[in-house]
């Protein structure tokens, strides 16, 4: 049997030649159109089914120049004649269409004279568009089609030929071309979007709709193009189709397109999607079994939250619960990465801007979710956004109580000095829709606003009806707090208008808007908490006070006046007095603001912004506020109760705080002296520290108390040595050491090393009862010329021999004293002191102790020497150490370091240290 003869259309060259010839013929050429279209149809069919679908067939077709005649053919066909009437719309096959030649009312009926040409044009267009769409799946073909002007003919076909199959292939070709940014811009410029939107509303075929939806999705490749699509009405038909999508494939295409169009959601996009009834279907699709559809629907809802106008409707449709549930799932143990949580976090925070959504969010467990975000160090970039969202609950008493119970206050305090999150700025359109921009001053107030204003006035947050405008919202106009006196006593005018607040930037709230930086939301919430009748449990704690003080002292410029008012409000509230005492808050205020030492600066100092004079004035003002509270009848009772009936920790804290906040002698004497507060504090020094800065606080407290006991005390000079060290007295022992001693020694003391030291028997016996009994009594040494001195080194014996022969201030006492920085325990100085006591030479002991003090406890000396001196165990030296530590004018840091050294040196034997410090504080040291 003979092999089948190959057809001419099997040759790509033949097909391209026929295509080129057809593209070069104008409408109404010399040949029979029917014959031409039939032959051309066979060529196009062969190109589509054999040549294009072959391996690398598209590239060969492009390389052989097939795209140019193909585009020319489309251009010729698009201009071949009038578009088929709307009655010919549909995807019915030609046989069905031609069967309707009999007259009748059927919509598809046409005369035979007008049917054949459009049908042939349709077949040509179908095949040519199919080939072009297939070719445009490759980047090189897309670029060439754009270069040869192939976009405009497609737009013309889309406009003129209203047949579903042709619209389908045209939209598919445009969608493929739109994958290139340059082609996408050209398609927009050619005006294709309105025709795609028109086809979207008129078409009924699912495949055609999917192609149009895909084309619109690919055309939304940039913010400008997405906005253009929304402004030309592309979103509403998509939303309307979503509610009636006949099959899952179309639903998937619609959701993907809406996801792309809603990125950076514009007002027009949100309006159209809402008006098209798309919110309800999107909420329903959030539980779709197919993951891609489900996640896309959730992200569309998250994108829509950027527009305030649609958020209330979104909440009514159930979007709040959907977004919270998805965010909770993604943050769970098997959740996804932080990047996938970001749009949901942003959406949930934006939902907090409307009251109706805040209520839904609170009831759905959103507060716990937001608190979890704040407590997560890995979510630190979102913390500023979350805090700003919580401002929406500013006047929701129930929500605030719940947030406080969940630990919001310390998180807010930490937020004041945290790292700035990388959050984009929200546009005006994201503002709360509770107060829309369209509101005018002449618009009558709604009942809800009147109720809000009446509540604010009744609760004391507004003094009168004019204090709050209907256009107020936390995001755009932070409510200024009323100017208030920082002192509860009207007579103290200096405390009512402190210079500190004026210097640090306080301005009258009624005349100038308060600054609203990154710290603004946190401060606004803290201010709201501080206005509670008793805010001590939340705000007068170590973390909260540290956060506020770190912000005030660490701000590069003037701090927000609201932070200063919070501190003033807390110190003026009698309900906070006990909390300030228990938490060492008063001591912290003095250390941080007045002395300039923060917890981070102890014991190693760190560089910080310096505004010491302003911070000092602020600290003194706050302590004065606490003094007013402490010296009131309520404060006296509270302090007395703490000192007598409080826990051991509270009693110590009260004793430590009294010198800072009590100035009345009768009060502090009763608390510290009569009721044992001072001895309690001194005893606690050698116990485990209840606060990281306890020893610093204690040293400062003892110094303040010393100033209260002796108000006119001046720096105490160190006792002078009997003889000036700079000009020592003549040495009386030196003549005995020369080659011709005069007078001649009548005995020698022999040391363990064999060294013999000359001495006078009479002088030695007269200087010490020990040597009087040894050398003049009935001991054998009284008859010996070589008297052994056991257990004595030459360096320790040297000051003893000098002292026995009358030397006072000759410098011999300095010999065994090591220089500062070297240990005294086990040194020659300790041995010399022991020898002076052993030989009953109290004057020598005093001289040696004074020498130790002169060298190791000089005013220029370091605090590390204080503990070394105390370790010698000498009462006079212990008093000297206490006096150096609490000396008026001493550097607070040195004082605290010295006290730390004393406590370490004392160990468990607290008695000597307690007595030494008590004597110095009370001014009764001998």
From Swiss-Prot:
Q: Where are the ARM repeats?
A: 139-179, 181-221, 223-263, 267-306, 307-354, 355-399, 401-440
Question: What cellular component terms from Gene Ontology apply here?
Answer: chromatin; Cul3-RING ubiquitin ligase complex; cytoplasm; cytosol; focal adhesion; membrane; nucleoplasm
Q: Which residues carry this modification: Phosphoserine?
A: 337
Residue spans with biased composition (Polar residues)?
484-498
Q: Which residues form the BTB domain?
A: 745-813
Q: Which GO terms describe its molecular function?
A: ubiquitin-like ligase-substrate adaptor activity
PROSITE patterns cross-referenced by the UniProt entry: BTB (PS50097)
Compartments, as annotated in UniProt: Nucleus; Chromosome; Cytoplasm
Describe how it is modified after translation.
Ubiquitinated by a BCR (BTB-CUL3-RBX1) E3 ubiquitin ligase complex, leading to its degradation. Deubiquitinated by USP7.
Which Gene3D superfamilies does this chain map to? Answer: Leucine-rich Repeat Variant, Potassium Channel Kv1.1, Chain A
Per the record, the domain of life is Eukaryota
Q: Where is the composition biased (Low complexity)?
A: 82-112
Segments traversing the membrane: none
The metabolic or biological pathway listed in the UniProt record of this protein is: Protein modification; protein ubiquitination
One BP term from GO: RNA polymerase II transcription initiation surveillance
Start and end residues of each stretch annotated as Disordered: 82-113, 467-498
Record keywords, A-Z? Chromosome, Cytoplasm, Nucleus, Phosphoprotein, Repeat, Ubl conjugation, Ubl conjugation pathway
Q: How does it assemble?
A: Substrate-recognition component of the BCR(ARMC5) E3 ubiquitin ligase complex, at least composed of CUL3, ARMC5 and RBX1.
Explain the purpose of this protein: Substrate-recognition component of a BCR (BTB-CUL3-RBX1) E3 ubiquitin ligase complex that terminates RNA polymerase II (Pol II) transcription in the promoter-proximal region of genes. The BCR(ARMC5) complex provides a quality checkpoint during transcription elongation by driving premature transcription termination of transcripts that are unfavorably configured for transcriptional elongation: the BCR(ARMC5) complex acts by mediating ubiquitination of Pol II subunit POLR2A phosphorylated at 'Ser-5' of the C-terminal domain (CTD), leading to POLR2A degradation.
Q: Can you name this protein? A: Armadillo repeat-containing protein 5
What is the native source organism of this protein? Rattus norvegicus (Rat)
Its taxonomic placement starts with:
Eukaryota, Metazoa, Chordata, Craniata, Vertebrata
């Amino acid at each position: 049997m003979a092999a089948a003869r190959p057809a001419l259309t099997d040759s790509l060259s033949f097909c391209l030649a026929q295509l080129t010839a057809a593209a070069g013929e104008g409408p109404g050429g010399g040949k029979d159109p029917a014959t031409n279209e039939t032959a051309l149809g066979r060529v196009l069919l062969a190109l589509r089914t054999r040549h294009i679908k072959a391996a690398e067939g598209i590239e060969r077709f492009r390389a052989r120049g097939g795209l140019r005649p193909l585009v020319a053919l489309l251009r010729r066909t698009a201009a071949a004649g009038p578009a088929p009437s709307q009655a010919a719309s549909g995807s019915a096959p030609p046989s069905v269409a031609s069967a309707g030649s009999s007259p009748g009312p059927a919509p598809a009926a046409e005369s035979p004279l007008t049917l054949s040409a459009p049908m042939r044009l349709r077949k040509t267009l179908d095949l040519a568009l199919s080939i072009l769409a297939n070719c445009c799946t490759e980047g090189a073909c897309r670029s060439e089609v754009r270069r040869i002007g192939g976009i405009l003919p497609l737009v013309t076909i889309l406009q003129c030929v209203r047949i579903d199959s042709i619209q389908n292939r045209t939209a598919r070709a445009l969608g493929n071309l739109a994958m290139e940014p340059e082609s996408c811009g050209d398609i927009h410029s050619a005006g294709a979007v309105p025709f795609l939107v028109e086809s979207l509303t008129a078409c009924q075929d699912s495949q055609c709709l999917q192609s149009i939806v895909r084309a619109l999705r690919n055309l939304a490749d940039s913010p400008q193009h997405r906005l253009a699509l929304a402004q030309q009405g592309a979103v509403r038909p998509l939303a309307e189709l979503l509610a009636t999508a006949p099959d899952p494939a179309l639903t998937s295409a619609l959701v993907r397109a809406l996801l792309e169009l809603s990125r950076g959601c514009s007002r027009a996009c949100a309006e159209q999607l809402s008006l098209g009834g798309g919110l309800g279907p999107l909420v329903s699709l959030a539980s779709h079994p197919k993951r891609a559809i489900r996640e896309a629907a959730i992200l569309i809802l998250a994108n829509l939250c950027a527009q305030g106008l649609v958020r209330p409707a979104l909440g009514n449709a159930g979007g709040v619960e959907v977004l919270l549930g998805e965010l909770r799932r993604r943050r769970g143990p098997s959740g996804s990465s932080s990047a996938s949580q970001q749009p949901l976090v942003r959406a949930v925070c934006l939902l907090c801007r409307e009251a109706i959504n805040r209520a839904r969010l609170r009831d759905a467990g959103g507060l716990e979710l937001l608190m979890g975000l704040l407590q997560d160090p890995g979510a630190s970039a979102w913390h500023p956004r979350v805090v700003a969202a919580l401002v929406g609950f500013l006047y929701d008493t129930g929500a605030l109580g719940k947030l406080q119970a969940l630990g919001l206050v310390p998180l807010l305090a930490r937020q004041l000095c945290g790292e700035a999150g990388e959050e984009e700025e929200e546009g005006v359109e994201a503002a709360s829709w509770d107060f829309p921009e369209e509101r005018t001053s002449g618009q009558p107030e709604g009942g809800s606003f009147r109720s809000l204003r009446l509540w604010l006035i009744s609760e004391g947050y507004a003094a009168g009806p004019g204090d709050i405008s209907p256009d107020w919202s936390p995001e755009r106009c932070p409510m200024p707090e009323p100017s208030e006196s920082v002192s509860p006593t009207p007579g103290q005018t200096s405390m009512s208008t402190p210079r500190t607040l004026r210097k640090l930037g306080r301005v009258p709230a009624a005349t100038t808007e308060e600054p609203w930086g990154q710290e603004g939301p946190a401060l606004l919430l803290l201010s709201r908490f501080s206005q509670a009748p008793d805010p001590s449990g939340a705000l007068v704690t170590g973390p909260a006070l540290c956060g506020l003080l770190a912000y005030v002292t660490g701000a590069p410029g003037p701090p927000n006046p609201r932070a200063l008012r919070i501190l003033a409000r807390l110190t003026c509230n009698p309900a906070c007095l006990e909390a300030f005492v228990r938490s060492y808050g008063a001591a912290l205020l003095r250390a941080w603001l007045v002395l300039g030492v923060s917890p981070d600066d102890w014991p190693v100092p760190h560089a910080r912004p310096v505004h010491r004079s302003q911070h000092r004035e602020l600290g003194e003002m706050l302590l004065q506020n606490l003094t007013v509270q402490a010296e009131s009848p309520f404060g006296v009772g509270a302090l007395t109760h703490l000192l007598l009936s409080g826990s051991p920790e509270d009693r110590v804290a009260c004793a430590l705080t009294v010198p800072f906040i009590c100035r009345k002698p009768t009060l502090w004497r009763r608390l510290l002296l009569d009721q044992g507060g001072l001895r309690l504090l001194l005893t606690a020094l050698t116990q485990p520290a209840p606060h990281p800065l306890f020893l610093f606080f204690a040293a400062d407290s003892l110094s303040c108390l010393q100033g209260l006991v002796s108000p006119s005390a001046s720096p105490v000079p160190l006792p002078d040595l009997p003889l000036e060290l700079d000009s020592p007295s003549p040495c009386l022992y030196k003549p005995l050491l020369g080659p011709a001693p005069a007078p001649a020694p009548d005995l020698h003391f022999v040391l363990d090393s064999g060294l013999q030291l000359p001495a006078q028997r009479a002088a030695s016996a007269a200087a010490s009862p020990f040597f009087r009994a040894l050398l003049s009594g009935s001991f054998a040494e009284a008859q010996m010329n070589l008297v052994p001195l056991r257990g004595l080194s030459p360096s320790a014996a040297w000051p003893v021999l000098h002292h026995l022969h009358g030397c006072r201030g000759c410098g011999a006492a300095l010999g065994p004293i090591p220089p500062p920085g070297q240990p005294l325990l086990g040194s020659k100085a300790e041995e010399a002191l022991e020898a002076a006591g052993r030989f009953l030479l109290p004057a020598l002991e005093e001289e040696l102790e004074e020498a130790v003090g002169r060298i190791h406890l000089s005013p220029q000396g370091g605090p590390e020497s204080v503990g070394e001196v105390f370790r010698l165990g000498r009462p006079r030296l212990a008093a000297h150490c206490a006096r150096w530590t609490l000396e008026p004018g001493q550097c607070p840091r040195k004082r605290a370091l010295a006290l730390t050294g004393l406590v370490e040196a004392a160990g468990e034997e607290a008695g000597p240290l307690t007595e030494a410090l008590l004597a110095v504080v009370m001014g009764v040291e001998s």
